[in-house]
C-alpha cells in the first residue's frame, strides 16, 4: 500500500471516529463532511519540508521513510574550534549514529589533505526536527556527501537528494521505502535523486508521474 493511500485511510478513520463520538453523545443527529469542515475535523494539513533556497557547505538533502510515508530530511554538519570531538544531535538512533561514524571514517580516508580539520575542530552533525526520532542506515550516502561538502567548502546543489547505506569501503547498499522516498522528493521540489544501484528494480513500484519529474541516478 502506498504512503498516500495509507494517509487517506488514517484520515478516514479519524473522521469516522469523530462522527461516532458526536452521534453517540447526541450532539448532532447527522454529520456532513464538507470541504470547509475538513480542517475542523482533521486540523491543519501536514507540513512537508521543501528544498533549501540557499545551499551552504555541509548541508545536504536526504530521503527518509516514516510510518506516515516518505519525507526529505536535511543533514547539517559544521566545524567549531576544538580538539576533535564529534557531537551528534537530532534524536538519532544507534544505527544512524553508526552510519555517521562510518561516514566520518570514510571521508577522512577520501580527503587525507583535510585531516587537520578533524583534529583541530569539533565536528557537529545535526538532523533537524529533534523531537522526531530517526534511525536506520539509509542516510549513509547523505552523511558522506554532507561531510565532503563541509571539508571542501563546496555546497551541494539544492535540487539534489539521495538515499543509500554506505559501507566502510565506500560501497552504496540497498535501502527500503524507495517509492515513498521518491514521492517525497518530487513533492519537495527535488529534481535529481541518487539511489543505490541494487534498488533499481524497485522503480517498477514508483508511479510514472513521479519518475517523469525526477532524474534518477543509480550509484554503487
Annotate the PLM regions.
Residues 3, 13, 74-77:
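Conserved P-loop NTPase
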Amino acid at each position: 500500500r502506498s504512503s498516500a493511500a495509507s494517509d487517506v485511510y488514517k484520515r478516514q478513520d479519524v473522521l469516522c471516529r469523530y462522527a461516532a463520538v458526536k452521534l453517540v453523545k447526541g450532539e448532532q443527529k447527522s454529520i456532513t463532511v464538507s470541504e470547509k469542515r475538513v480542517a475542523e475535523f482533521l486540523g491543519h494539513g501536514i507540513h512537508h519540508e521543501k528544498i533549501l533556497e540557499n545551499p551552504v557547505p555541509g548541508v545536504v538533502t536526504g530521503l527518509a521513510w516514516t510510518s506516515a510515508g516518505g519525507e526529505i530530511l536535511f543533514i547539517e554538519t559544521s566545524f567549531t574550534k576544538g580538539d576533535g570531538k564529534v557531537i551528534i544531535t537530532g534524536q538519532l538512533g544507534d544505527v544512524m549514529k553508526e552510519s555517521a561514524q562510518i561516514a566520518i571514517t570514510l571521508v577522512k580516508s577520501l580527503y587525507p589533505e583535510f585531516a587537520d580539520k578533524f583534529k583541530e575542530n569539533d565536528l557537529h552533525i545535526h538532523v533537524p526536527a529533534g523531537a522526531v526520532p530517526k534511525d536506520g542506515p539509509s542516510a549513509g550516502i547523505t552523511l558522506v556527501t554532507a561531510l565532503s561538502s563541509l571539508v571542501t567548502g563546496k555546497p551541494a546543489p539544492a535540487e539534489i537528494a539521495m538515499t543509500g547505506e554506505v559501507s566502510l569501503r565506500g560501497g552504496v547498499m540497498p535501502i527500503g521505502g524507495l517509492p515513498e522516498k521518491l514521492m517525497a522528493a518530487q513533492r519537495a521540489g527535488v529534481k535529481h535523486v541518487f539511489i543505490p544501484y541494487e534498488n533499481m528494480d524497485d522503480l517498477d513500484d514508483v508511479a510514472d508521474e513521479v519518475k517523469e519529474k525526477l532524474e534518477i541516478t543509480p550509484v554503487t
